Amino acid sequence: QIKYKYFSDKALQLWELCYAFFDRAHKVNMSPEIQDYLLAKNFNIVFEDIIDKLIGDHNIPAGLKEQDDGKLVDHMYTYKGLTTYEEDKPIYYIGDSKYYKRGTKIGKESVYKQFTYARNVIQWNLNLFMNDDTDDSILQYDKKNFGNVPKLRDDVTEGYNVIPNFFISAKLDDNLSYQDRIEITDKQNTHFTNSQFKNRLFDRDTLLVCHYDVNFLYVVSLYARNNTLQKQAWKSKVRKMFREEIQKMLSSQYNFYAMQAHPNEDAKKYLQEHFQQTLGKVFTPFNNNQIFSLALDKDDPEGNNEELLTELRKHFFIIDNSIGNNPEGEIAKVVEKEKIKYIYSETEADSLVLVGCIRSDA
């Protein structure tokens, strides 16, 4: 039917390309031996992009994702903090992902890099509240668009909030399953810590990094799916898990308490006068700034935990309170139970009237 008809060279080339494409597709469909492969010179970049798309935020301040010292953070997002229960007090989580070969350990440089990221986040946060340089356009932009995050430094106790920081590495299940699995790594070092002073969790120089393994085949399959709901559900699940696992790690190392000053006790004045004894151990993470969080290292490296608790109990109501829990209900019960000891002021004591009676002999 097309005899004696003429076609341009471009049309013939297009026909040949289309024929080659559909012929190959047909052969692939008919032959199980023909497979497609993904070739990557540096698979770390591919894995990093997969994880960032699945757990990260994209609306990140430029000074955090691309830091002033030239370092580029792999993953960052805001989520509920470790030390509080309020949803309206988000904190930045910092992550680093690597596609490690089996048996490969995380190097010292990678750990140091994560600690540096955390220090930079702290400084960026403080600049939002303490730097008024109107000529710094980036700072003013961040203040306007990211000023909803709480201040990491507590002015009353001079303590610092805990920065969540983690490694996430790929792992293949032994049976090569696509099961959704993410867990604390089975390597020797499940977490890393860095501190200048012992027994000061709420110190600016006390930093931590946790390490998780994720089923590589699952995240690749999830990344490739055109299913926004599944991806969002996994993101929510993983963020919640990261927070809880870091809290578990901290709870294994520290005893956490909540404390509130006795009536007629000036908490701010007391903490200022006993600054050296409480520095790095006390922080105010709650909306009720009359309630403080106290963290003491279980190993008691200074050998004075009990002495400090005894002294603090002379001035504060103190209860056991797991990290991130709301202490208001329990501490209110303690205050109500004990307030009779503190209810009367000197003025009220002077106004008391003693009433009695004497039995008559008649």
Locations of regions flagged by a protein language model:
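Interdomain/boundary linker segments immediately adjacent to catalytic/signaling cores
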Residues: Q1-I45
